[in-house]
């Protein structure tokens, strides 16, 4: 035997490669209340047994590597390893299965979504033995979630700050998203807020470009907010996008927003990164700023049914990292989102305790204990005819955000805002009177048109607009 391959049997170490399932597939394991649990949709390469593929996922996302190593004997693998504890078939898919993996809590740094994701999804998704892999859900135990601050303020504190109750909030993304000067941008903000909206918004890619530097935009938007508040008597806000190329620059922009006295800032949490997002969330809580979160880049990660991560996982990660709002699809607009799936992760964002419900894609019971909730934002291709459905689907604790559905009004920005506010108030009143918005919604809107010419004009311009494409991500 060559010295390079000699086995040191005398010290209990046997070199070589062995099947993952011999160590990491443990169907007899009883999960602990402190374990982080994961549900993976696994598509193995032909010839790879489900037990081996599931064990490989557990190994490569925890303590394992491709071969036995001498240093395994210097720690307790039984204490620290991930375990594939259950495998179930995927109905209608002969080549796929769900692998359930339990991770001991000590594998993860406290209060770090960055470390959590680096471990669970950082390397294993490129594993050759797998044709595809998707993380469908995570169970975050209270013993781990309590190490996070979570949202800077949460739903109830936001309502108290705004003094607005009993209805969804209304927003608008300023369009065109790129190319306006700071002064013209501020003008559009003022007109929309004066017309009745609660918020206006920077689009996700509005940062600090040559045509509109961030400081100029912040100043003109703050002026627009103050003017609209003075005229309407309502508290208004504009999501000032603080996303930047460095964390230091991001915080500098948030500091300037606070100095201007605005109520809310914004961050692109996936392109900006979880470390940056958590830092900004901590600053916002310490300084009384609300934090709006855009999910730009999410579809790169979550849209494919067989590979990547489901948005419910990204939503849970955001709740821990911190944000008071997050975009969550519309069900009825131009962006992807099936109703039951969307409402499943909306509950994961807002509620304290969510029961396991596979009919809505929720694989685990989730207890957030005292962590504040996040308000879902419905945005993307919506207009006044969608208002009854949006009110019925998302309920009061949501933001309904109309960009083109405000600024595309034939009479201008302020009438577009008026149309949306009238439509919302009509839907809320009808719901409170016991009317069924799902069945009577169009009639509610038509009745409101009789005393709102702005709404009537909006209804006429968008009466034929629909986005009727089949969704990709079904249960």
Curated annotation (Swiss-Prot):
<feature type="binding site">
    <location>
        <position position="295"/>
    </location>
    <ligand>
        <name>substrate</name>
    </ligand>
</feature>
<feature type="binding site" description="via carbamate group">
    <location>
        <position position="201"/>
    </location>
    <ligand>
        <name>Mg(2+)</name>
    </ligand>
</feature>
<comment type="function">
    <text>RuBisCO catalyzes two reactions: the carboxylation of D-ribulose 1,5-bisphosphate, the primary event in carbon dioxide fixation, as well as the oxidative fragmentation of the pentose substrate in the photorespiration process. Both reactions occur simultaneously and in competition at the same active site.</text>
</comment>
<dbReference type="GO" id="GO:0019253">
    <property type="term" value="P:reductive pentose-phosphate cycle"/>
</dbReference>
<dbReference type="InterPro" id="IPR036376">
    <property type="entry name" value="RuBisCO_lsu_C_sf"/>
</dbReference>
<keyword id="KW-0479">Metal-binding</keyword>
<keyword id="KW-0934">Plastid</keyword>
<feature type="binding site">
    <location>
        <position position="204"/>
    </location>
    <ligand>
        <name>Mg(2+)</name>
    </ligand>
</feature>
<keyword id="KW-0602">Photosynthesis</keyword>
<dbReference type="InterPro" id="IPR036422">
    <property type="entry name" value="RuBisCO_lsu_N_sf"/>
</dbReference>
<comment type="similarity">
    <text>Belongs to the RuBisCO large chain family. Type I subfamily.</text>
</comment>
<dbReference type="GO" id="GO:0004497">
    <property type="term" value="F:monooxygenase activity"/>
</dbReference>
<feature type="binding site">
    <location>
        <position position="203"/>
    </location>
    <ligand>
        <name>Mg(2+)</name>
    </ligand>
</feature>
<feature type="active site" description="Proton acceptor">
    <location>
        <position position="175"/>
    </location>
</feature>
<keyword id="KW-1015">Disulfide bond</keyword>
<dbReference type="GO" id="GO:0000287">
    <property type="term" value="F:magnesium ion binding"/>
</dbReference>
<feature type="modified residue" description="N6-carboxylysine">
    <location>
        <position position="201"/>
    </location>
</feature>
<protein>
    <recommendedName>
        <fullName>Ribulose bisphosphate carboxylase large chain</fullName>
        <ecNumber>4.1.1.39</ecNumber>
    </recommendedName>
</protein>
<feature type="binding site">
    <location>
        <position position="379"/>
    </location>
    <ligand>
        <name>substrate</name>
    </ligand>
</feature>
<keyword id="KW-0488">Methylation</keyword>
<feature type="binding site">
    <location>
        <position position="327"/>
    </location>
    <ligand>
        <name>substrate</name>
    </ligand>
</feature>
<feature type="binding site" description="in homodimeric partner">
    <location>
        <position position="123"/>
    </location>
    <ligand>
        <name>substrate</name>
    </ligand>
</feature>
<dbReference type="InterPro" id="IPR033966">
    <property type="entry name" value="RuBisCO"/>
</dbReference>
<feature type="propeptide">
    <location>
        <begin position="1"/>
        <end position="2"/>
    </location>
</feature>
<dbReference type="InterPro" id="IPR020878">
    <property type="entry name" value="RuBisCo_large_chain_AS"/>
</dbReference>
<keyword id="KW-0456">Lyase</keyword>
<keyword id="KW-0120">Carbon dioxide fixation</keyword>
<feature type="active site" description="Proton acceptor">
    <location>
        <position position="294"/>
    </location>
</feature>
<dbReference type="GO" id="GO:0016984">
    <property type="term" value="F:ribulose-bisphosphate carboxylase activity"/>
</dbReference>
<keyword id="KW-0503">Monooxygenase</keyword>
<feature type="site" description="Transition state stabilizer">
    <location>
        <position position="334"/>
    </location>
</feature>
<feature type="binding site">
    <location>
        <position position="173"/>
    </location>
    <ligand>
        <name>substrate</name>
    </ligand>
</feature>
<dbReference type="GO" id="GO:0009853">
    <property type="term" value="P:photorespiration"/>
</dbReference>
<keyword id="KW-0560">Oxidoreductase</keyword>
<feature type="modified residue" description="N6,N6,N6-trimethyllysine">
    <location>
        <position position="14"/>
    </location>
</feature>
<dbReference type="InterPro" id="IPR017443">
    <property type="entry name" value="RuBisCO_lsu_fd_N"/>
</dbReference>
<feature type="binding site">
    <location>
        <position position="177"/>
    </location>
    <ligand>
        <name>substrate</name>
    </ligand>
</feature>
<keyword id="KW-0460">Magnesium</keyword>
<dbReference type="InterPro" id="IPR020888">
    <property type="entry name" value="RuBisCO_lsuI"/>
</dbReference>
<dbReference type="GO" id="GO:0009507">
    <property type="term" value="C:chloroplast"/>
</dbReference>
<dbReference type="InterPro" id="IPR000685">
    <property type="entry name" value="RuBisCO_lsu_C"/>
</dbReference>
<comment type="subunit">
    <text>Heterohexadecamer of 8 large chains and 8 small chains; disulfide-linked. The disulfide link is formed within the large subunit homodimers.</text>
</comment>
């Amino acid at each position: 035997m060559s010295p390079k391959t000699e086995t040191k049997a005398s010290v209990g170490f046997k070199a070589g490669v062995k099947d993952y399932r011999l160590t990491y597939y443990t169907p007899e394991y009883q999960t602990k209340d402190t374990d982080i649990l994961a549900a993976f949709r696994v598509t193995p390469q032909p010839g790879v047994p489900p037990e081996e593929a599931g064990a490989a996922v557990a190994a490569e996302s925890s303590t394992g590597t491709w071969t036995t190593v001498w240093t395994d004997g210097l720690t307790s693998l039984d204490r620290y390893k991930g375990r594939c504890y259950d495998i179930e078939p995927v109905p209608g898919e002969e080549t796929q299965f769900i692998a359930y993996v339990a991770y001991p809590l000590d594998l993860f740094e406290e209060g770090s979504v960055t470390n959590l994701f680096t471990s669970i999804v950082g390397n294993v998704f490129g594993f050759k033995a797998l044709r595809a892999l998707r993380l469908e859900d995570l169970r975050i135990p209270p013993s781990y979630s309590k190490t996070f601050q979570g949202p800077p303020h949460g739903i109830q504190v936001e309502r108290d700050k705004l003094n607005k109750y009993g209805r969804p909030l209304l927003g608008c993304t300023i369009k065109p998203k790129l190319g306006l000067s700071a002064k013209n941008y501020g003008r559009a903000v003022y007109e929309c807020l004066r017309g009745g909206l609660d918020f206006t918004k920077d689009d996700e890619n509005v940062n600090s470009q040559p045509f509109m530097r961030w400081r100029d935009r912040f100043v003109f938007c703050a002026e627009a907010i103050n003017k609209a508040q003075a005229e309407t008597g309502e508290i208004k806000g504009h999501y000032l996008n603080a996303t930047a190329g460095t964390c230091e620059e991001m915080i500098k922009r948030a500091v300037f927003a606070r100095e201007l006295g605005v109520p809310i800032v914004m961050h692109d949490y996936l392109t900006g990164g979880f470390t940056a997002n958590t830092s900004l969330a901590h600053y916002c809580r310490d300084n009384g700023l609300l934090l709006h979160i855009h999910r730009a880049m999410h579809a790169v990660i979550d849209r494919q049914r067989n590979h990547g991560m489901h948005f419910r996982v990204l939503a849970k990660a955001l709740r821990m990292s911190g944000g008071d709002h997050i975009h969550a699809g519309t069900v009825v607009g131009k962006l992807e989102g099936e109703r039951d799936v969307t409402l499943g992760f909306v509950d994961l964002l807002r509620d304290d305790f969510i029961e396991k419900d596979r009919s809505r894609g929720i694989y685990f019971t989730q207890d957030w204990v005292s962590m504040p909730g996040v308000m879902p934002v419905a945005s993307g291709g919506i207009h006044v005819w969608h208002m009854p459905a949006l009110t019925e689907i998302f309920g009061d604790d949501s933001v309904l955000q109309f960009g083109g559905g405000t600024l595309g009004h034939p009479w201008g920005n302020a009438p577009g805002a008026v149309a949306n506010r009238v439509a919302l108030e009509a839907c809320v009143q009808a719901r409170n009177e016991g009317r069924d918005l799902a069945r009577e919604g169009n009639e509610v809107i038509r009745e409101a048109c009789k005393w709102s010419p702005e709404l009537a004009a909006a209804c006429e311009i968008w009466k034929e607009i629909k986005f009727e494409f089949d969704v990709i991500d079904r249960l």
